Regions:
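Short, conserved beta-strand element in jelly-roll/cupin
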Residues: 53-66, 72-74, 80-93, 135
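Compositionally biased, non-globular sequence tracts
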Residues: 1-8, 14, 80, 86-92, ...
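Conserved metal-binding segment of the jelly-roll/cupin
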Residues: 102-121
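A short hydrophobic beta-strand segment most commonly corresponding to one strand
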Residues: 108-110, 126-138
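A short, N-terminal "cap"/entry segment at the start of jelly-roll beta-barrel domains
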Residues: 1-36, 43-51
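Conserved short histidine dyad/triad with adjacent acidic residue
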Residues: 34-52, 62-77, 113
Length: 138
């Protein structure tokens, strides 16, 4: 594990991390930082996939549950071209060509730049989620 990924995981193990307000938390400047967010998951037959080139995502579910779709990024049909300023592109993946990862409170997924991923999907019924996404520069 790289030192930056170690910092990301170490941050998620801190006491009180579940009490953080929404927003950005600096961990190691622009090399490692966290985005705290709360939202309701959605039911959909066509998940909205995304990918990043500059950062690895460590997506930690602090409370609630969700399904994150995963597929190799080359399977994505882009609906919004890559925006380098925001480090994100959006697209879809043909049904049957992606995998669903079920995450519940206390679990995480590490998503690399080659990974297309579709967060915020309901795991059955729609539910409220608190997620901390730690961004780790490649």
């Amino acid at each position: 594990m790289t030192p930056a990924l170690r910092k990301a995981i170490g941050f998620l193990r801190l006491r009180g991390v579940n009490d953080l307000p929404d927003g950005t938390v600096e961990i190691d400047g622009t090399n490692v930082f966290a985005i705290v967010q709360r939202y309701d998951t959605v039911k959909t037959d066509v998940p909205k996939f995304e990918y990043h080139q500059q950062y690895i995502d460590v997506q930690f579910i602090a409370s609630g549950e969700e399904v994150i779709g995963w597929a190799p990024r080359e399977r994505m049909l882009l609906t919004e071209a890559y925006d380098a300023g925001k480090d994100i592109a959006f697209g879809t993946v043909e049904k049957g060509k992606w995998t669903a990862a079920y995450l519940q409170a206390g679990q995480l997924a590490v998503l690399f730049p080659e990974d297309g991923h579709a967060p915020k999907n309901a795991a059955g019924a729609e539910s409220s989620v608190m997620k901390i996404v730690v961004k780790v520069a490649r």
